[in-house]
Amino acid sequence: VERVIDGPTAEKLHCRILAEGANGPTTPDADRVLDQRRDEVFLIPDILCNSGGVIVSYFEWVQGLQRLFWSEDEVNNRLKILMTRAFAKVMHRSAKDGVSHRVAATAMGVERVQAAKRARGLFP
């Protein structure tokens, strides 16, 4: 459900935490409002909040490739470790650079892609 939180909606939010479980649920106007309200509304941006599904898909791929089977508990534990680590890194980067959680998460993602391309080349 994309772009359902626009500027006026973001101004009216009464939540303490906005965890974006969908892809792109906020408009750029809403993002500006949420950045101004960051002391009131703690934003967990979509790029971070909903990455668990992608991570678990990767786990499935690894298990299939290596003919492994992880229990549900093992998958959940591995997911918790990665999500907790990513959350901490985004929060640290946001505080260090004085930017929103979304800007921090996006910058970190772009930097990781850039590093991978540098290491492997454009067409591996």
Q: Which functions belong to the PLM regions below?
A:
Residues 1-5, 10, 20:
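Rossmann-like NAD(P)-binding element
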